[in-house]
A protein has these predicted regions:
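Active-site signature of cysteine proteases
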Residues: 1-164
Length: 164
C-alpha cells in the first residue's frame, strides 16, 4: 500500500525508522544544486549571502553562480525552512522529480550538532565519503519523492491513523 503523508509525518516516519534500526528505500531528486557530487545534500539559504557586508559582500556579489553554489555547500550553513506548500509547489511544477533511488540507514551529526541522514548511494565508492552521502533534514523534507519502509518502522500514532 502507499500513502501520501504530510511533511511532518513523513519526517517522523523516516526518523523513527533509522532510530529503531530500520533502513529504508529513498527516492529523491539528485539533480538539485544542493545534492553535490562530494557526498552532501543540503538546501542552503542563498539569501544569507545578501546579509553580508563589506569585503564579504563584495566577494559574494562577484562570484559566479557555480562558485556561489560551491561556497554554499562547502561547510555547514543556514538552510531554508521547508514547508508543505514549498514541497507541493516543487512537485507540481516539476522542479522536484524522482530521478534516483538510494538507501537511508542512519543519522549523523556535523560539528554543530545538526543532524543528517546517512545515505548509501549506488554510484560505487564515489565522492568525498566513498559512496555515502549526508542529506540534511531540510533536503530530505524538500526533495523526497517516496520511501519504502517496513510497517513496523512507522510510529504507532501514524500507523494507527493509516489503519495499520
Amino acid at each position: 500500500m502507499s500513502y501520501n503523508l504530510p511533511i511532518d509525518e513523513l519526517m517522523a516516519v523516516m526518523d523513527n525508522a533509522v532510530k529503531n534500526g530500520y533502513t529504508f528505500a529513498w527516492g529523491s531528486d539528485v539533480s538539485e544544486q544542493g545534492f553535490t557530487r562530494d557526498g552532501i545534500a543540503v538546501c542552503p539559504d542563498a539569501a544569507k549571502g545578501a546579509e553580508l557586508t563589506g569585503s564579504d559582500m563584495a566577494r559574494w556579489t562577484g562570484m559566479s553562480q557555480a562558485d556561489k553554489r560551491k561556497e554554499l555547500t562547502s561547510k555547514p550553513m543556514p538552510e531554508i525552512t521547508v514547508t508543505q506548500e514549498m514541497r507541493q509547489e516543487a512537485f507540481d511544477n516539476w522542479e522536484t522529480t524522482d530521478d534516483h533511488g538510494m538507501l537511508i540507514y542512519g543519522i549523523a551529526k556535523d560539528q554543530n550538532g545538526k543532524e543528517y541522514f546517512m545515505v548509501k548511494n549506488s554510484w560505487g565508492e564515489s565522492g568525498k565519503y566513498k559512496g555515502i552521502w549526508y542529506a540534511s533534514k531540510a533536503f530530505v523534507a524538500y526533495k523526497t519523492m517516496n520511501i519504502l519502509v517496513h510497517k513496523d518502522a512507522i510510529p504507532a500514532d501514524i500507523a494507527k491513523k493509516l489503519g495499520l
